[in-house]
Amino acid sequence: MKRKDDDQEDRSCSSASKLDPIPLDLKMATVPTKSHMKKSHQNKLEEDEKEDTNPSKLELDSLPLDLKMAILTRIPAKSLMKLRCVSKMWSSIIRSRGFIDSYYAISSKQSRFIVGLSNAAFNEPEKQLTFLFSFSHEDGEKSSSSSLVPNFEMAVPCSLAGLSHSLASFHGILAVEGKVMCNPNTEQFTTLPVGTIFVGYDPIDDQYKALGFDFDKRCHGNAIGHKVWTLGGGEGMRQIRGDLAPYRPILLPNVCINGVIYYGAHTLSQTKDPVIVCFDVRSEKLSFITAPAVVLQSGMKSILIDYKGKLASIVRNSCGGCISSFVFWILEDPKKHEWSRQSCDFPYSLWDYVGNVRICFFGTNKAGEIIIAPMFLSRDVRSFYIFYYNVETKTMRRVRLRGIGSDIEFRRSYGSENKLCNCHVRIAHQHVESIAFLKDHINLRT
């Protein structure tokens, strides 16, 4: 009965609370490289300030630079994008590395999550889009049951239609299925090199890199080599060599934790032992971590996530097509390859809210709660829920994402009206707002 009331509330929202149709403004660009606000840039800001002689700006421009930056850090990100047009000096401040870092540090105290909806109604790649919506984690973490209102951010020209396709956030920049990187706040995106499989971020050097494979032509699917692109600095693709034996990657979403990309694989030995492949983004070194056989399973029966800075695997147990429980494996010691495990039960009431739709585990929030949500919008118009599972207390709470797929107008606007095609859902957890300009930071050469 509660779900029906929620649906009724969604449909009765005033027009002011509904999402607007798609304001498509897709911009090509390029992504982030490391730099700091050096003295030369300080001089540039002062020069820009001298050039702006409009009397209406003099009062603001006479403020000390530190005070100007302190004021600007309190302004919403998308409003800052408009303020770039006020003067050259304001634009220089907003685009400076020092200000970008300060803004990110403040934004990191209030993380958000991004929901990506990908329509599969068109076969032509150029017509496939992923729509990105942002939500605040803060309200949901303070109550046992609540609803959140979405903000439409932007659309990017790629699809999330595959089971292994993922949406991930790296230091304020989103990676959409190894094809596109974008910043929702600047509404810029850039296409990743062809052949990219995974994207990782090194927090020490503030560097993004893409990883791809060379596959054995005689036995497709066996990785026998690796190629890397540095997303920034103008470097082209390069081969990296390691002493790893050939292996076959498992089609699972990867996870990047503290500058290391983790993904599943099977060795090509007679026993086909499951392993976790580790790629250190900074050193570009590869290594194996052995894992229990059940930790890595294809077909989304298991999934790797970041749990409080540790690699974890969730292995689902099904009963009658519904997940009844899951086993939670945590890599406690990467050097000794030691794992811990615990069993977690699902309350059957969850299925009252998601219907007959496959669910997935999309990482955790800052509190360490596992985020669970449907992988598709229901083909019937109904409210969309996500769930937070606390592994320590074995409790779960639900949060309704208002407006997402809950009325026909939304579905028509965002390409999910066709009941014959799935609208795919992916979630990037713990996203932090950044105002980094892609064209200032990622310079791709393939």
Curated annotation (Swiss-Prot):
<feature type="domain" description="F-box">
    <location>
        <begin position="57"/>
        <end position="107"/>
    </location>
</feature>
<dbReference type="InterPro" id="IPR001810">
    <property type="entry name" value="F-box_dom"/>
</dbReference>
<dbReference type="Pfam" id="PF08268">
    <property type="entry name" value="FBA_3"/>
</dbReference>
<feature type="compositionally biased region" description="Basic and acidic residues">
    <location>
        <begin position="43"/>
        <end position="57"/>
    </location>
</feature>
<dbReference type="InterPro" id="IPR013187">
    <property type="entry name" value="F-box-assoc_dom_typ3"/>
</dbReference>
<feature type="region of interest" description="Disordered">
    <location>
        <begin position="1"/>
        <end position="57"/>
    </location>
</feature>
<feature type="compositionally biased region" description="Basic and acidic residues">
    <location>
        <begin position="1"/>
        <end position="12"/>
    </location>
</feature>
<dbReference type="InterPro" id="IPR017451">
    <property type="entry name" value="F-box-assoc_interact_dom"/>
</dbReference>
<dbReference type="InterPro" id="IPR036047">
    <property type="entry name" value="F-box-like_dom_sf"/>
</dbReference>
<dbReference type="Pfam" id="PF00646">
    <property type="entry name" value="F-box"/>
</dbReference>
<protein>
    <recommendedName>
        <fullName>Putative F-box protein At1g32660</fullName>
    </recommendedName>
</protein>
